[in-house]
Regions:
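N-terminal beta-strand motif that seeds the catalytic metal site of vicinal oxygen chelate
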Residues: 1-24, 83-88, 136
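Vicinal oxygen chelate
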Residues: 1-6, 97-136
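Core segments of cupin and vicinal oxygen chelate
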Residues: 14-61
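Short, conserved charged micro-motifs
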Residues: 22, 94-98
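A short, acidic/glycine-rich surface segment
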Residues: 38-40, 70-75
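Short beta-strand micro-motifs in enzyme catalytic cores
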Residues: 48-52, 84, 116-118
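Conserved beta-strand in the GNAT
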Residues: 63-66, 128-129
Length: 136
């Protein structure tokens, strides 16, 4: 698989997931994030609380993947109150096309490059978008 393209903005997003290990593997393999810290049931948190803090090496964007004790395993839905989607900015239409190809290589279904946007979903059905500003 080719090396991951770049992001430009967003510092940290905390996402509730059903399986922090599975999600951290996906965010690493598909988007190129790296694990900074993991907490799987340490004494600092309840034993059923899992947390993985990840960082993208180029942009410095951080995500937290958190499995909460009260999560009953239901998939994400943007139709409930809370997060609708996460949008990451890329530098150019060319970089957006590189991302489309990378998603294809990883077997991740996506919208294809529509104008200046590609949308896809993570293992918990959270919608992610890659966007580049149109030339002015």
């Amino acid at each position: 698989m080719t090396s991951p393209p770049t992001f430009e903005r967003v510092m940290y997003v905390g996402l509730s997931v059903t399986d922090a290990r599975r999600s951290s593997a996906w965010y690493a393999d598909v988007l190129g994030f790296e694990v900074e810290r993991e907490n799987f049931g340490s004494t600092a948190r309840p034993s059923d609380w899992d947390e993985v803090l990840m960082r993208h090496p180029h942009s410095g964007i951080r995500i937290g993947l958190l499995r909460h004790p009260s999560n009953n395993g239901a998939p994400f839905s943007e139709f409930r109150t809370g997060l609708d989607h996460v949008e990451l900015e890329v530098a150019s239409p060319r970089e957006l096309e590189r991302w489309r190809r990378r998603l294809d290589e990883a077997g991740v279904p996506h919208s294809g490059a529509r104008d200046y946007l590609v949308t896809f979903r993570d293992p918990d059905n959270i919608q992610l978008e890659l966007f580049c500003e149109p030339a002015r």
